[in-house]
Amino acid sequence: MEEIQRYLQLKRSQQHDFLYPLIFQEYIYAFAHDRDFGRSILSENLGSKSKSSLLVVKRLISRMYQQNRFILSLNDSNQNPFWTCNNNFDSQIISEGFALIGEIPFSLRFKSCLEEKNKVNSQSLRSIHSIFPFLEDNFSHLNYILDILITHPVHVEILVQNLRYWLKDASSLHLLRFLLNDYWNSLITPKKASSSFSKKNQRLFLFLYNSHVCEYEYFFVFIRKQSSHLLSTSYGVFLERIYCYEKVERLXNVFIKVKDLQANLWLVKEPCMHYVRYQRKFILASKGTSVLMNKWKCYLVTFWQWHFSLWFHPRRIYINQLSNHSLEFLGYLSSVRMNPSVVRSQILENSFLINNGIKKLETLVPIFLLITSLAKAKFCNVLGHPISKPVWADLSDSNIIDRFGRISRNLSHYYSGSSKKKSLYRVKYILRLSCARTLARKHKSTVRAFLKRLGSELLEEFLMSEEDILSLTFPKPSSTLRGVYRSRIWYLDIIWINDLANYKSKI
Protein backbone atom coordinates (compact mmCIF):
# COMPACT_ATOMS: atom_id res chain seq x y z
CA MET A 1 0.00 0.00 0.00
CA GLU A 2 2.90 2.37 0.70
CA GLU A 3 4.19 1.78 -2.82
CA ILE A 4 0.81 2.68 -4.30
CA GLN A 5 0.64 5.86 -2.22
CA ARG A 6 4.09 6.83 -3.38
CA TYR A 7 2.92 6.58 -6.98
CA LEU A 8 -0.13 8.72 -6.25
CA GLN A 9 1.57 11.55 -4.37
CA LEU A 10 0.01 14.91 -5.03
CA LYS A 11 1.82 17.84 -6.57
CA ARG A 12 1.31 21.19 -4.91
CA SER A 13 1.15 22.96 -8.24
CA GLN A 14 -2.08 21.14 -9.02
CA GLN A 15 -3.90 22.80 -6.16
CA HIS A 16 -3.57 26.35 -7.52
CA ASP A 17 -6.40 28.08 -9.35
CA PHE A 18 -4.53 28.81 -12.56
CA LEU A 19 -7.09 28.23 -15.32
CA TYR A 20 -9.60 30.93 -14.43
CA PRO A 21 -7.04 33.80 -14.17
CA LEU A 22 -5.44 32.77 -17.47
CA ILE A 23 -8.64 32.97 -19.44
CA PHE A 24 -9.09 36.65 -18.55
CA GLN A 25 -5.47 37.88 -18.63
CA GLU A 26 -3.67 39.73 -21.40
CA TYR A 27 -0.70 37.36 -21.73
CA ILE A 28 -2.64 34.19 -22.42
CA TYR A 29 -1.78 34.11 -26.13
CA ALA A 30 1.91 34.13 -25.23
CA PHE A 31 1.45 30.72 -23.61
CA ALA A 32 -0.36 29.29 -26.61
CA HIS A 33 2.31 30.25 -29.10
CA ASP A 34 5.27 29.16 -27.01
CA ARG A 35 7.42 26.94 -29.22
CA ASP A 36 8.28 24.64 -26.32
CA PHE A 37 4.71 23.39 -26.07
CA GLY A 38 4.64 22.20 -29.67
CA ARG A 39 2.73 23.79 -32.50
CA SER A 40 0.77 20.65 -33.29
CA ILE A 41 -0.70 20.50 -29.78
CA LEU A 42 -1.55 24.06 -28.90
CA SER A 43 -1.80 26.10 -32.08
CA GLU A 44 -3.08 23.68 -34.68
CA ASN A 45 -5.69 25.08 -37.05
CA LEU A 46 -8.98 23.20 -37.20
CA GLY A 47 -10.06 24.51 -40.58
CA SER A 48 -10.83 27.85 -42.16
CA LYS A 49 -14.26 28.09 -40.53
CA SER A 50 -13.13 27.11 -37.06
CA LYS A 51 -9.85 28.95 -36.53
CA SER A 52 -9.47 30.08 -32.95
CA SER A 53 -6.73 32.00 -31.26
CA LEU A 54 -6.57 33.00 -27.64
CA LEU A 55 -6.56 36.65 -28.65
CA VAL A 56 -9.94 36.14 -30.35
CA VAL A 57 -11.24 34.41 -27.23
CA LYS A 58 -10.00 37.26 -25.06
CA ARG A 59 -11.72 39.89 -27.20
CA LEU A 60 -14.92 37.85 -27.38
CA ILE A 61 -15.10 37.54 -23.60
CA SER A 62 -14.47 41.28 -23.22
CA ARG A 63 -17.26 42.05 -25.70
CA MET A 64 -19.64 39.78 -23.82
CA TYR A 65 -18.87 41.54 -20.57
CA GLN A 66 -19.50 44.93 -22.16
CA GLN A 67 -22.88 43.75 -23.39
CA ASN A 68 -23.72 42.11 -20.03
CA ARG A 69 -24.30 38.77 -21.68
CA PHE A 70 -23.35 36.82 -18.59
CA ILE A 71 -26.18 38.43 -16.58
CA LEU A 72 -29.38 36.43 -16.77
CA SER A 73 -32.74 38.13 -16.51
CA LEU A 74 -34.62 37.36 -13.34
CA ASN A 75 -37.96 38.10 -14.98
CA ASP A 76 -37.50 35.59 -17.79
CA SER A 77 -35.44 32.65 -16.55
CA ASN A 78 -36.16 30.57 -19.65
CA GLN A 79 -34.17 32.85 -21.91
CA ASN A 80 -30.42 32.78 -22.17
CA PRO A 81 -29.09 36.16 -23.39
CA PHE A 82 -25.60 34.70 -23.62
CA TRP A 83 -26.40 33.16 -26.98
CA THR A 84 -28.60 35.88 -28.47
CA CYS A 85 -26.07 36.91 -31.12
CA ASN A 86 -23.89 34.64 -33.23
CA ASN A 87 -24.93 31.67 -31.11
CA ASN A 88 -22.94 28.95 -32.89
CA PHE A 89 -19.86 31.06 -33.51
CA ASP A 90 -19.60 32.35 -29.93
CA SER A 91 -20.16 28.89 -28.49
CA GLN A 92 -17.53 27.36 -30.75
CA ILE A 93 -14.91 30.02 -30.06
CA ILE A 94 -15.42 29.90 -26.28
CA SER A 95 -15.36 26.09 -26.12
CA GLU A 96 -12.25 25.79 -28.29
CA GLY A 97 -10.56 28.51 -26.27
CA PHE A 98 -11.37 26.63 -23.07
CA ALA A 99 -9.83 23.45 -24.47
CA LEU A 100 -6.83 25.38 -25.79
CA ILE A 101 -6.13 26.74 -22.32
CA GLY A 102 -6.77 23.41 -20.65
CA GLU A 103 -4.12 21.76 -22.80
CA ILE A 104 -1.42 24.09 -21.47
CA PRO A 105 -0.95 22.53 -17.99
CA PHE A 106 -1.18 19.02 -19.44
CA SER A 107 1.54 19.85 -21.96
CA LEU A 108 3.72 21.34 -19.24
CA ARG A 109 3.35 18.27 -17.05
CA PHE A 110 3.99 15.93 -19.97
CA LYS A 111 7.15 17.84 -20.84
CA SER A 112 8.40 17.74 -17.25
CA CYS A 113 7.57 14.02 -17.08
CA LEU A 114 9.76 13.32 -20.10
CA GLU A 115 12.59 15.38 -18.63
CA GLU A 116 12.41 13.52 -15.32
CA LYS A 117 12.65 10.14 -17.05
CA ASN A 118 15.35 11.28 -19.53
CA LYS A 119 13.17 10.37 -22.50
CA VAL A 120 14.62 12.69 -25.09
CA ASN A 121 13.29 10.92 -28.16
CA SER A 122 9.59 10.56 -27.48
CA GLN A 123 8.85 10.00 -31.18
CA SER A 124 9.88 6.35 -30.82
CA LEU A 125 6.88 5.77 -28.56
CA ARG A 126 4.39 7.34 -30.94
CA SER A 127 4.27 4.73 -33.67
CA ILE A 128 1.08 2.73 -33.75
CA HIS A 129 2.85 -0.29 -35.19
CA SER A 130 5.32 -0.36 -32.32
CA ILE A 131 2.51 -2.08 -30.42
CA PHE A 132 2.69 -5.20 -32.55
CA PRO A 133 6.40 -5.99 -32.01
CA PHE A 134 5.62 -5.57 -28.32
CA LEU A 135 2.76 -8.07 -28.63
CA GLU A 136 4.97 -10.50 -30.55
CA ASP A 137 7.58 -10.44 -27.80
CA ASN A 138 5.16 -10.88 -24.91
CA PHE A 139 1.79 -12.30 -25.96
CA SER A 140 3.18 -15.63 -27.11
CA HIS A 141 4.01 -16.38 -23.45
CA LEU A 142 0.59 -15.34 -22.11
CA ASN A 143 -2.64 -17.26 -21.74
CA TYR A 144 -5.59 -14.92 -21.14
CA ILE A 145 -6.57 -11.38 -22.03
CA LEU A 146 -9.16 -8.94 -20.74
CA ASP A 147 -10.70 -7.11 -23.69
CA ILE A 148 -12.19 -3.94 -22.20
CA LEU A 149 -14.40 -1.38 -23.96
CA ILE A 150 -14.51 2.08 -22.40
CA THR A 151 -18.00 3.44 -21.82
CA HIS A 152 -19.08 6.88 -22.96
CA PRO A 153 -19.87 9.34 -20.15
CA VAL A 154 -23.60 9.16 -19.44
CA HIS A 155 -23.82 12.63 -17.90
CA VAL A 156 -22.00 15.91 -18.39
CA GLU A 157 -21.25 16.09 -14.67
CA ILE A 158 -18.93 13.09 -15.02
CA LEU A 159 -16.83 15.03 -17.51
CA VAL A 160 -16.70 17.99 -15.15
CA GLN A 161 -15.75 15.78 -12.20
CA ASN A 162 -12.88 14.31 -14.23
CA LEU A 163 -11.33 17.76 -14.37
CA ARG A 164 -12.02 18.48 -10.71
CA TYR A 165 -9.42 15.90 -9.70
CA TRP A 166 -6.61 18.08 -11.01
CA LEU A 167 -8.27 21.51 -11.20
CA LYS A 168 -9.66 23.37 -8.18
CA ASP A 169 -11.21 26.34 -9.95
CA ALA A 170 -14.96 26.70 -9.47
CA SER A 171 -15.38 29.48 -12.03
CA SER A 172 -13.80 27.50 -14.85
CA LEU A 173 -15.81 24.42 -13.96
CA HIS A 174 -19.03 26.47 -14.04
CA LEU A 175 -18.08 27.75 -17.48
CA LEU A 176 -17.50 24.17 -18.62
CA ARG A 177 -20.89 23.10 -17.23
CA PHE A 178 -22.49 25.98 -19.08
CA LEU A 179 -20.94 24.88 -22.37
CA LEU A 180 -21.79 21.22 -21.91
CA ASN A 181 -25.37 21.74 -20.80
CA ASP A 182 -25.99 23.56 -24.07
CA TYR A 183 -25.19 20.27 -25.82
CA TRP A 184 -26.76 17.90 -23.33
CA ASN A 185 -29.38 16.63 -25.76
CA SER A 186 -26.67 15.71 -28.23
CA LEU A 187 -24.47 14.01 -25.66
CA ILE A 188 -27.14 11.58 -24.46
CA THR A 189 -27.92 10.30 -27.97
CA PRO A 190 -24.91 8.31 -29.12
CA LYS A 191 -24.97 8.86 -32.88
CA LYS A 192 -26.56 12.24 -33.58
CA ALA A 193 -25.26 13.73 -30.40
CA SER A 194 -21.64 12.90 -30.65
CA SER A 195 -21.44 13.90 -34.29
CA SER A 196 -23.08 17.30 -33.68
CA PHE A 197 -20.99 18.04 -30.61
CA SER A 198 -17.68 16.88 -32.07
CA LYS A 199 -18.09 18.73 -35.36
CA LYS A 200 -18.90 22.09 -33.78
CA ASN A 201 -16.51 21.81 -30.84
CA GLN A 202 -13.89 19.35 -31.97
CA ARG A 203 -11.03 20.53 -29.77
CA LEU A 204 -13.14 20.65 -26.59
CA PHE A 205 -14.69 17.27 -27.36
CA LEU A 206 -11.30 15.60 -27.81
CA PHE A 207 -9.88 17.26 -24.72
CA LEU A 208 -12.76 16.14 -22.49
CA TYR A 209 -12.92 12.66 -23.96
CA ASN A 210 -9.18 12.13 -23.51
CA SER A 211 -9.44 13.23 -19.89
CA HIS A 212 -12.33 10.77 -19.47
CA VAL A 213 -10.30 7.93 -21.01
CA CYS A 214 -7.32 8.71 -18.82
CA GLU A 215 -9.53 8.47 -15.73
CA TYR A 216 -10.04 4.86 -16.72
CA GLU A 217 -6.37 4.48 -17.47
CA TYR A 218 -4.80 5.92 -14.34
CA PHE A 219 -5.59 2.79 -12.34
CA PHE A 220 -2.96 0.93 -14.35
CA VAL A 221 -0.21 2.90 -12.66
CA PHE A 222 -0.14 -0.06 -10.28
CA ILE A 223 1.27 -2.23 -13.07
CA ARG A 224 3.25 0.51 -14.75
CA LYS A 225 6.62 -1.18 -14.33
CA GLN A 226 5.35 -4.32 -16.03
CA SER A 227 4.30 -2.35 -19.14
CA SER A 228 7.42 -0.19 -19.37
CA HIS A 229 8.05 -1.20 -23.00
CA LEU A 230 5.05 0.76 -24.19
CA LEU A 231 4.31 3.54 -21.72
CA SER A 232 1.28 5.50 -22.77
CA THR A 233 2.08 9.16 -23.36
CA SER A 234 -0.74 10.07 -21.02
CA TYR A 235 0.82 8.32 -18.03
CA GLY A 236 2.97 11.19 -16.87
CA VAL A 237 0.24 13.71 -17.61
CA PHE A 238 -2.87 12.30 -16.02
CA LEU A 239 -1.71 10.07 -13.18
CA GLU A 240 -1.73 12.30 -10.12
CA ARG A 241 -5.18 13.06 -8.74
CA ILE A 242 -6.64 14.99 -5.85
CA TYR A 243 -8.38 12.77 -3.27
CA CYS A 244 -6.52 9.67 -4.47
CA TYR A 245 -5.88 8.51 -0.90
CA GLU A 246 -9.61 8.30 -0.29
CA LYS A 247 -10.03 6.17 -3.40
CA VAL A 248 -7.28 3.78 -2.37
CA GLU A 249 -8.77 3.38 1.09
CA ARG A 250 -12.18 2.72 -0.40
CA LEU A 251 -10.68 0.08 -2.67
CA UNK A 252 -9.13 -1.66 0.31
CA ASN A 253 -12.40 -1.58 2.23
CA VAL A 254 -14.37 -2.96 -0.71
CA PHE A 255 -12.09 -5.92 -1.18
CA ILE A 256 -11.58 -6.65 2.47
CA LYS A 257 -15.24 -7.63 2.49
CA VAL A 258 -14.64 -10.07 -0.35
CA LYS A 259 -11.16 -11.37 0.40
CA ASP A 260 -8.48 -10.79 2.95
CA LEU A 261 -5.97 -7.98 2.46
CA GLN A 262 -3.08 -10.25 1.50
CA ALA A 263 -5.02 -11.68 -1.42
CA ASN A 264 -5.82 -8.13 -2.46
CA LEU A 265 -2.21 -7.00 -2.57
CA TRP A 266 -1.23 -10.13 -4.43
CA LEU A 267 -3.87 -9.32 -7.03
CA VAL A 268 -2.46 -5.84 -7.59
CA LYS A 269 1.17 -6.96 -7.67
CA GLU A 270 0.72 -9.86 -10.08
CA PRO A 271 4.05 -9.66 -11.93
CA CYS A 272 3.14 -10.73 -15.45
CA MET A 273 0.40 -8.33 -16.50
CA HIS A 274 0.75 -6.46 -19.79
CA TYR A 275 -1.37 -3.48 -20.68
CA VAL A 276 -2.04 -1.81 -24.05
CA ARG A 277 -4.61 0.83 -24.95
CA TYR A 278 -5.76 2.30 -28.23
CA GLN A 279 -8.79 4.61 -28.52
CA ARG A 280 -11.72 2.99 -26.65
CA LYS A 281 -10.07 -0.38 -26.06
CA PHE A 282 -7.98 -1.68 -23.19
CA ILE A 283 -6.10 -4.95 -23.36
CA LEU A 284 -4.89 -6.53 -20.14
CA ALA A 285 -3.03 -9.81 -20.69
CA SER A 286 -1.61 -12.30 -18.22
CA LYS A 287 -0.04 -15.75 -18.13
CA GLY A 288 -2.22 -16.59 -15.14
CA THR A 289 -5.34 -18.71 -14.96
CA SER A 290 -8.96 -17.89 -15.69
CA VAL A 291 -9.58 -17.55 -11.94
CA LEU A 292 -7.03 -14.74 -11.77
CA MET A 293 -8.58 -12.95 -14.74
CA ASN A 294 -12.03 -13.18 -13.16
CA LYS A 295 -10.58 -11.53 -10.05
CA TRP A 296 -9.21 -8.73 -12.19
CA LYS A 297 -12.57 -8.34 -13.89
CA CYS A 298 -14.39 -8.09 -10.56
CA TYR A 299 -11.76 -5.67 -9.32
CA LEU A 300 -12.03 -3.34 -12.32
CA VAL A 301 -15.83 -3.36 -12.45
CA THR A 302 -16.12 -2.55 -8.74
CA PHE A 303 -13.49 0.16 -8.89
CA TRP A 304 -14.90 1.93 -11.95
CA GLN A 305 -18.48 1.73 -10.68
CA TRP A 306 -17.51 3.46 -7.48
CA HIS A 307 -15.16 5.93 -9.13
CA PHE A 308 -17.58 7.10 -11.84
CA SER A 309 -20.78 6.57 -9.83
CA LEU A 310 -22.40 4.61 -12.64
CA TRP A 311 -23.29 1.06 -13.55
CA PHE A 312 -20.39 -0.50 -15.44
CA HIS A 313 -21.78 -3.51 -17.27
CA PRO A 314 -19.58 -6.59 -16.76
CA ARG A 315 -20.22 -7.61 -20.37
CA ARG A 316 -17.97 -4.77 -21.48
CA ILE A 317 -15.05 -6.83 -20.19
CA TYR A 318 -14.43 -10.04 -22.10
CA ILE A 319 -12.14 -12.80 -20.86
CA ASN A 320 -10.64 -14.63 -23.83
CA GLN A 321 -8.09 -17.37 -24.07
CA LEU A 322 -5.46 -16.38 -26.61
CA SER A 323 -5.17 -19.86 -28.08
CA ASN A 324 -8.91 -20.10 -28.85
CA HIS A 325 -10.02 -16.55 -29.67
CA SER A 326 -8.97 -13.85 -32.11
CA LEU A 327 -8.48 -10.34 -30.84
CA GLU A 328 -9.82 -7.43 -32.92
CA PHE A 329 -7.28 -4.70 -32.33
CA LEU A 330 -5.92 -1.86 -34.48
CA GLY A 331 -7.57 -3.21 -37.59
CA TYR A 332 -6.02 -6.69 -37.28
CA LEU A 333 -7.31 -10.04 -36.12
CA SER A 334 -4.61 -11.18 -33.72
CA SER A 335 -4.32 -14.59 -32.08
CA VAL A 336 -1.71 -16.91 -30.62
CA ARG A 337 -1.35 -20.17 -32.51
CA MET A 338 0.68 -23.28 -31.76
CA ASN A 339 3.07 -24.08 -34.61
CA PRO A 340 4.09 -27.76 -34.50
CA SER A 341 7.76 -28.57 -34.93
CA VAL A 342 9.12 -32.11 -35.30
CA VAL A 343 12.73 -32.77 -34.30
CA ARG A 344 14.46 -36.07 -35.09
CA SER A 345 16.98 -37.14 -32.46
CA GLN A 346 19.28 -40.14 -32.83
CA ILE A 347 21.29 -41.82 -30.09
CA LEU A 348 23.49 -44.63 -31.40
CA GLU A 349 21.15 -46.97 -33.25
CA ASN A 350 17.94 -45.57 -31.76
CA SER A 351 16.14 -42.58 -33.25
CA PHE A 352 13.35 -40.54 -31.72
CA LEU A 353 10.83 -38.05 -33.08
CA ILE A 354 10.15 -35.19 -30.69
CA ASN A 355 7.08 -33.02 -31.27
CA ASN A 356 7.54 -29.46 -30.06
CA GLY A 357 4.96 -26.72 -30.17
CA ILE A 358 6.02 -23.11 -30.54
CA LYS A 359 3.55 -20.33 -29.79
CA LYS A 360 3.45 -17.58 -32.39
CA LEU A 361 1.42 -14.40 -32.71
CA GLU A 362 -0.61 -14.33 -35.91
CA THR A 363 -1.91 -11.05 -37.30
CA LEU A 364 -4.48 -11.45 -40.07
CA VAL A 365 -6.23 -8.96 -42.32
CA PRO A 366 -9.99 -8.85 -41.54
CA ILE A 367 -10.98 -9.31 -45.17
CA PHE A 368 -14.76 -9.42 -44.65
CA LEU A 369 -14.75 -6.23 -42.61
CA LEU A 370 -12.49 -4.52 -45.14
CA ILE A 371 -14.81 -5.53 -47.98
CA THR A 372 -17.71 -4.10 -45.98
CA SER A 373 -15.82 -0.81 -45.66
CA LEU A 374 -15.00 -0.82 -49.37
CA ALA A 375 -18.66 -1.48 -50.15
CA LYS A 376 -19.75 1.47 -48.00
CA ALA A 377 -17.26 3.65 -49.87
CA LYS A 378 -18.73 2.42 -53.21
CA PHE A 379 -15.62 0.61 -54.45
CA CYS A 380 -17.39 -2.77 -54.61
CA ASN A 381 -20.67 -4.43 -53.72
CA VAL A 382 -21.32 -6.40 -50.55
CA LEU A 383 -20.01 -9.57 -52.22
CA GLY A 384 -16.67 -7.96 -53.04
CA HIS A 385 -17.22 -7.49 -56.79
CA PRO A 386 -15.55 -4.24 -57.96
CA ILE A 387 -17.77 -1.41 -59.25
CA SER A 388 -17.05 2.02 -60.67
CA LYS A 389 -16.82 5.18 -58.58
CA PRO A 390 -19.17 7.62 -60.37
CA VAL A 391 -18.39 10.61 -58.14
CA TRP A 392 -14.76 10.53 -59.32
CA ALA A 393 -15.58 10.17 -63.02
CA ASP A 394 -15.30 13.94 -63.59
CA LEU A 395 -11.68 14.05 -62.44
CA SER A 396 -8.66 13.76 -64.70
CA ASP A 397 -7.25 10.32 -65.49
CA SER A 398 -4.08 10.95 -63.52
CA ASN A 399 -6.07 12.18 -60.52
CA ILE A 400 -8.31 9.11 -60.56
CA ILE A 401 -5.35 6.73 -60.79
CA ASP A 402 -3.54 8.64 -58.05
CA ARG A 403 -6.50 8.44 -55.67
CA PHE A 404 -7.01 4.72 -56.12
CA GLY A 405 -3.27 4.09 -55.96
CA ARG A 406 -2.89 6.10 -52.76
CA ILE A 407 -5.62 4.08 -51.04
CA SER A 408 -4.02 0.85 -52.22
CA ARG A 409 -0.57 1.91 -51.00
CA ASN A 410 -1.91 3.02 -47.63
CA LEU A 411 -3.63 -0.32 -47.09
CA SER A 412 -0.55 -2.20 -48.25
CA HIS A 413 1.62 -0.08 -45.98
CA TYR A 414 -0.55 -0.60 -42.94
CA TYR A 415 -1.30 -4.30 -43.39
CA SER A 416 2.24 -5.26 -44.39
CA GLY A 417 2.65 -6.83 -40.96
CA SER A 418 0.01 -9.43 -41.70
CA SER A 419 1.01 -13.08 -41.38
CA LYS A 420 -0.86 -13.98 -44.58
CA LYS A 421 -1.08 -11.43 -47.38
CA LYS A 422 -3.50 -13.29 -49.65
CA SER A 423 -6.42 -11.23 -48.34
CA LEU A 424 -4.46 -8.04 -48.93
CA TYR A 425 -3.94 -9.00 -52.58
CA ARG A 426 -7.70 -9.39 -52.95
CA VAL A 427 -8.23 -5.85 -51.65
CA LYS A 428 -5.64 -4.56 -54.15
CA TYR A 429 -7.46 -6.40 -56.94
CA ILE A 430 -10.77 -4.78 -55.96
CA LEU A 431 -9.26 -1.30 -55.99
CA ARG A 432 -7.43 -1.85 -59.28
CA LEU A 433 -10.51 -3.13 -61.10
CA SER A 434 -12.68 -0.41 -59.55
CA CYS A 435 -10.22 2.16 -60.89
CA ALA A 436 -10.38 0.58 -64.34
CA ARG A 437 -14.20 0.57 -64.29
CA THR A 438 -14.23 4.24 -63.24
CA LEU A 439 -11.90 5.22 -66.09
CA ALA A 440 -13.88 3.13 -68.57
CA ARG A 441 -17.10 4.80 -67.40
CA LYS A 442 -15.53 8.22 -67.92
CA HIS A 443 -14.34 7.43 -71.47
CA LYS A 444 -17.49 5.41 -72.31
CA SER A 445 -15.49 2.30 -73.06
CA THR A 446 -15.29 -1.29 -71.87
CA VAL A 447 -12.97 -2.33 -69.07
CA ARG A 448 -11.12 -4.84 -71.25
CA ALA A 449 -10.46 -2.32 -73.99
CA PHE A 450 -9.37 0.31 -71.54
CA LEU A 451 -6.99 -2.03 -69.69
CA LYS A 452 -5.53 -3.14 -73.00
CA ARG A 453 -4.94 0.46 -74.03
CA LEU A 454 -3.59 1.67 -70.67
CA GLY A 455 -1.65 -1.51 -69.98
CA SER A 456 1.32 -1.46 -67.63
CA GLU A 457 0.83 2.14 -66.46
CA LEU A 458 -2.20 1.22 -64.38
CA LEU A 459 -0.57 -2.02 -63.30
CA GLU A 460 2.57 -0.33 -61.97
CA GLU A 461 0.52 2.06 -59.86
CA PHE A 462 -1.05 -0.77 -57.87
CA LEU A 463 1.64 -3.44 -57.87
CA MET A 464 4.44 -1.52 -56.17
CA SER A 465 4.95 -3.98 -53.37
CA GLU A 466 7.02 -3.97 -50.23
CA GLU A 467 9.80 -5.68 -52.18
CA ASP A 468 10.02 -2.67 -54.51
CA ILE A 469 10.02 -0.30 -51.55
CA LEU A 470 12.78 -2.25 -49.82
CA SER A 471 14.81 -2.29 -53.04
CA LEU A 472 15.00 1.49 -52.76
CA THR A 473 16.80 1.00 -49.44
CA PHE A 474 19.00 -2.00 -50.25
CA PRO A 475 21.29 -1.48 -53.27
CA LYS A 476 21.05 -5.02 -54.66
CA PRO A 477 18.12 -7.44 -54.54
CA SER A 478 18.99 -10.75 -52.99
CA SER A 479 17.42 -13.88 -51.59
CA THR A 480 17.56 -12.27 -48.17
CA LEU A 481 15.40 -9.41 -49.45
CA ARG A 482 12.82 -11.86 -50.79
CA GLY A 483 12.74 -13.55 -47.41
CA VAL A 484 12.12 -10.22 -45.73
CA TYR A 485 9.28 -9.57 -48.13
CA ARG A 486 7.61 -12.84 -47.28
CA SER A 487 7.85 -12.09 -43.57
CA ARG A 488 6.06 -9.38 -41.63
CA ILE A 489 7.20 -5.81 -42.11
CA TRP A 490 6.14 -3.34 -39.42
CA TYR A 491 6.44 0.22 -40.67
CA LEU A 492 7.27 2.18 -37.53
CA ASP A 493 6.57 5.60 -39.03
CA ILE A 494 2.77 5.36 -38.78
CA ILE A 495 1.52 7.84 -36.18
CA TRP A 496 -2.12 8.20 -37.20
CA ILE A 497 -4.24 5.99 -39.42
CA ASN A 498 -7.77 7.42 -39.21
CA ASP A 499 -10.15 4.76 -40.55
CA LEU A 500 -7.58 2.03 -41.20
CA ALA A 501 -7.77 0.83 -37.60
CA ASN A 502 -11.52 1.47 -37.51
CA TYR A 503 -12.45 -0.83 -40.35
CA LYS A 504 -16.16 -0.49 -39.62
CA SER A 505 -15.95 3.12 -40.83
CA LYS A 506 -15.58 4.33 -44.35
CA ILE A 507 -12.16 4.32 -45.95
From Swiss-Prot:
Annotated protein name in UniProt: Maturase K
Subcellular compartments: Plastid, Chloroplast
Q: Which GO terms describe its cellular component?
A: chloroplast
Keywords from the named record: Chloroplast, mRNA processing, Plastid, RNA-binding, tRNA processing
Picking any one GO molecular function of the record gives:
RNA binding
Metal-binding as UniProt keyword:
no
As given in the record, the signal peptide range reads none
Could you tell me what this protein does?
Usually encoded in the trnK tRNA gene intron. Probably assists in splicing its own and other chloroplast group II introns.
- Domain of life, per UniProt, equals Eukaryota
Q: What family classification does the UniProt entry report for this protein?
A: Belongs to the intron maturase 2 family. MatK subfamily.
Q: Which InterPro entries match?
A: Domain_X, Maturase_MatK, Maturase_MatK_N
Q: What is its main location?
A: plastid
Record bears the keyword Plastid: yes
Q: Which GO terms describe its biological process?
A: mRNA processing; RNA splicing; tRNA processing
Q: Which Pfam families does the UniProt entry name for this protein? A: Intron_maturas2 (PF01348), MatK_N (PF01824)
